[in-house]
Curated annotation (Swiss-Prot):
UniProt keyword Nucleotide-binding present: no
Physiological role: Transcriptional regulator that plays a central role in Notch signaling, a signaling pathway involved in cell-cell communication that regulates a broad spectrum of cell-fate determinations. Acts as a transcriptional repressor when it is not associated with Notch proteins. When associated with some Notch protein, it acts as a transcriptional activator that activates transcription of Notch target genes.
GO-annotated cellular components: nucleus
Region (Disordered): 22-59
Protein name as catalogued: Suppressor of hairless homolog
Gene it is expressed from: RBP-JK
């Protein structure tokens, strides 16, 4: 019997901070690399391209020993592109930079390990330096170089989309390569919707794609006197909420019942967020949460108490700390404080707030890619990175097939169950089919499943690149040894009404996949 789980098989941690220092000559060179001639592998090529000892390395098929080492050490390379879901269009000569600015994070220890391997192999300290460029996927704008100077993250603060670009949606593209010339690949963000400007009219759910649903991620930023240089973002660092001018946080916004009490555990509601409702903001990275808040519409320097329309993208809003004496979430320089509003003498449905208590809200998204050089550096880019969305188990007993559904699949991919490579058939870019290995592949001498055995599911490319998933496969205990072929033939010739289910050992019950969010 079998069971499928969606479980994280490791904790994400920010390891492998890269030290990158570049001369003007190197900056000029990497710019040539990005603006060079596209090659058939999705990268770029120029005549001045440096040569690496790994450049012409033939593909190395992943071995069981290499997979075993990977499962023990998990030297992954994770790349995260964090960005807003909408972008405001620029008109004429103005440049409305994407806000909050797209962020690139390089996580896990594999980046540091790869850097050391390339530096030692090519005997050059610049060989392991990571170069990254970002663009909006348009030939009208050059890609901008990102500054990974001694950090594992960087931001693109000067990206914009002009009115000459007629696209209604676009994706950011990040191109990366090492100083040795080895390409990491080209990575896309999630889709971003282009809007002209925030709507000042009362919103309705007819424009649901601009509304904000409970449970989705948002960013909050404050811009004093509409000055770009004064922009600060709500962020969590060192266990504290603060207003950062460098990094921004992504927060899950949950809708609560009005009578929900303050607690570390709370019940959330579905639906779109409306002004006047009780919400909870939870940091998507640390899990830290603010107290219960009532979200209120902002008009100039006042919070409207009786507004009840849906919250929309790039609206200005205020967050009243529920059950407090007119206290609002506010910033003061880098600190997050409580600001006490004052009633409007002529308008009882409004309270006066200061600029620091007015926040702009926008939905966010992220694209995350994880991979590992299981057999050492390869000459090909790791992209496109396959992504698994779901698994479907078919059959059972002696023959069980697993359908893998996702995107960016290719005939060069194999499904691995732990240390065991499965017979894999390529269907299309969205589907793979594989044979579930026998339990004896994992437990020597076993002819049936005596106790639960859980193994991770990973995808592996023909040149040893490992693409981990957060999925596991569980072999669940069977009632006894599987029947011999002679026994199966006897059963198949027996009248149906004489077969007792408990007399057919080893066939078990097929347990359909159960999915749990993590």
């Amino acid at each position: 019997m079998y069971h499928l789980n969606v479980t994280p098989d490791k904790q994400t941690s920010p390891h492998g901070c890269l030290v990158v220092s570049e001369t003007d000559q190197q900056r000029s060179h990497v710019k040539e690399r990005v603006n060079g001639t596209p090659n058939q592998n999705g990268g770029t090529s120029t005549s001045s391209k440096p040569r690496s000892v790994f450049e012409n390395r033939p593909p190395q098929r992943l071995t069981r020993e290499a997979m075993s080492k990977y499962l023990r050490e998990r030297n992954d390379q994770t790349l995260i592109i964090l960005h807003a879901k909408v972008a405001q269009k620029s008109y004429g000569n103005e440049k409305r930079f994407l806000c909050p600015p797209p962020c690139l994070y390089l996580m896990e220890s594999g980046w540091k390990q790869k850097q050391q391997i390339l530096e030692e192999a090519d005997q050059a300290p610049e060989a392991g330096q990571v170069h990254a460029f970002i663009g909006i996927g348009s030939s009208d704008q050059e890609m901008q170089q990102l500054n990974l100077d001694g950090k594992n993250f960087c931001t693109a603060k000067t990206l914009y989309i002009s009115d000459t670009d007629k696209r209604k949606h676009f994706m950011l593209c990040v191109k990366m390569f090492f100083g040795s010339g080895l390409e990491v690949g080209a990575f896309n963000s999630r889709r971003i919707k282009v809007i002209s400007k925030p709507s000042k009219k009362k919103q309705s759910l007819k424009n649901a794609d601009l509304c904000i649903a409970s449970g989705t991620k948002v960013a909050l930023f404050n811009r004093l006197r509409s000055q770009t240089v004064s922009t600060r973002y709500l962020h969590v660092e060192n266990g504290n909420f603060h207003a950062s001018s460098i990094q921004w946080g992504s927060f899950a916004i949950h809708l609560l019942d009005d009578d929900e009490s303050e607690s570390e555990e709370f019940t959330v509601r579905d639906g779109y967020i409306h002004y006047g409702q009780t919400v909870k903001l939870v940091c998507s990275t640390t899990g830290m949460a603010l107290p219960r808040l009532i979200i209120r519409k902002v008009d100039k320097q006042t919070a409207i108490l009786n507004a009840d329309d849906p919250v929309s993208q790039l609206h200005k809003c205020a967050f009243y700390l529920k059950d407090s004496e007119r206290m609002y979430l506010c910033l003061s320089q880098e600190r997050i404080i409580q600001f006490q509003a004052t009633p409007c003498p002529k308008e009882p449905n409004k309270e006066m707030i200061n600029d620091g208590a007015s926040w702009t809200i926008i939905s966010t998204d992220k694209a995350e890619y994880t991979f590992c050089d299981g057999m050492g550096p390869t000459s090909k880019p790791v992209t496109p990175v396959p992504v698994v969305h779901s698994l479907q188990l078919n059959g059972g007993g002696d023959v069980a097939m697993l359908e893998v559904n996702g995107e960016n699949f290719s005939p060069q991919l194999k499904v691995w169950f732990g240390e065991v490579e499965a017979d894999t058939m390529y269907r299309c870019e969205e589907g793979l089919l594989c044979v579930v290995p026998d339990i004896s592949e994992f437990r020597e001498g076993w002819t049936w499943v005596k106790q639960s055995v859980q193994v991770p599911i990973n995808l592996v490319r023909h040149d040893g690149i490992i693409y981990p998933t957060n999925l596991t496969f569980t072999f669940t205990p069977e009632p006894g040894p599987r029947p011999t072929l002679a026994r199966l033939l006897y059963i198949s010739s027996t009248p149906r009404d004489r077969i007792m289910p408990d007399r057919v050992p080893g066939r078990g019950v097929l347990i359909r996949p159960t999915w749990t969010t993590t």
